[in-house]
Amino acid sequence: MRFRLALSLLSLALFAAPAAAQLEVDITGGIAQPMPIAIPGMPTPAVANTPAGDTAALGQRVADVVTNDLKNSGLFSPLPKSALQTVTHPQVTAPDYMFWTQSGAQALIQGFVQANGDGSLTVGCYLYDVLARTELTRQGFVVQPAQWRRAAHKCADLVYTRLTGEGPYFDSRVVYVSETGPKTNRIKRLAIMDQDGANHRFLTNGQTIVLTPRFAPNQQTITYMSYTNNRARVYVYDIGSGSQRLVVDQPNMTFAPRFSPDGRTIVFSMAVGGNTDIYRVSAGGGTPQRLTTSPGIDTGASYSPDGSKIVFESDRSGTQQLYVMNADGSNQNRISFGSGRYGSAAWSPRGDLIAFTKIGGGFNVGIMNIDGSGEKILTNGWQDEGPSWSPNGRVIMFFRTAQGSGKADLWSVDLTGVNERPVPTPLDGSDPAWGPLLP
């Protein structure tokens, strides 16, 4: 679905953005008090029925999604609905600043939902500094009714980016492994959903075990490992068509795949003669190229965002540790030297950090600089693992396994380690992979 800036919103008001004010959220050291923000329901100039509901109801639903997104970031404290004013369509561009000042809000989001003659919707999004009585930014989105949630996520992204200075991440998807059944006989299916758990659907039927799904940069392709005929093999799945194909037709076990940043290459591990090494192959298939040659197990490769380097895990030193090498396999260097073992490394899309699972008295998710310095543990569950980065590199999704039951759930945490929250899924979930920002 392509989004475009609306060309006629409240008499072209969206094209007259004022100069930026100074209201902002500082997220560099964590937030003691989230910013109070008001997000009233979005009015409509004329109630019209759409396949997704009438525009009046959609206005409230859009506001609810924006509220949920910003609240979940941990940086904002949306006012309760009981403290909100009912906004009329003319008030969208003329806020009642006196009311909102008395409400305690520092920032205000107002907008509208309008049905267009071609069957599309226009969703307008405006951000105001309440104390300075200034408009900070505005944008409009033209979408099909079925895509109204994406317009809401885009609005939340607009506000988040303007007030934090960080990149957006709400308009994105997650692919993961949905699990059900007893822990000794789990049924595992690929599933995909919006980052907030909405629009959930299953991609595979559970007849084979699937693990470690990873998005391609084009967001329409997933690579993953599947046990077929009792053999681990790497596949590629097309989300649009539902088709899947084998990446490498080898008699050996292949697993832990991941796309390169340009989507042209898949890096994976292959077990040959009792030794496991990292290989790369064209995403379209072909002859694999071996990148590591050390004794032991080398696996869990993850590219740097510029594609020049790869972080991976290896037990070549006697314990499971993290290493970084050039994308062609040269210049391999260990970067983890703390107590315990390290695995499931993931390079931040910002390029500045590496997330990992640390094993030592438990499983915990942490981050470090790309040279291994500045290690910081973010979680303290019984078994937390499998970190995956948000598109802006500020939030990490992982899965947490409960002691005893084997029940696994998806969670997210920010880089401060303070804002930890569960991610809703209809069944148990593991191996999350956060996809790029949608176009």
Curated annotation (Swiss-Prot):
The Tol-Pal system is composed of five core proteins: the inner membrane proteins TolA, TolQ and TolR, the periplasmic protein TolB and the outer membrane protein Pal. They form a network linking the inner and outer membranes and the peptidoglycan layer. This is Tol-Pal system protein TolB. It comes from Rhizorhabdus wittichii (strain DSM 6014 / CCUG 31198 / JCM 15750 / NBRC 105917 / EY 4224 / RW1). The keyword Cytoplasm does not apply. One of its GO terms (biological process) is cell division. SUPFAM superfamilies: TolB, N-terminal domain, Tricorn protease N-terminal domain. It is found in: Periplasm. Belongs to the TolB family.
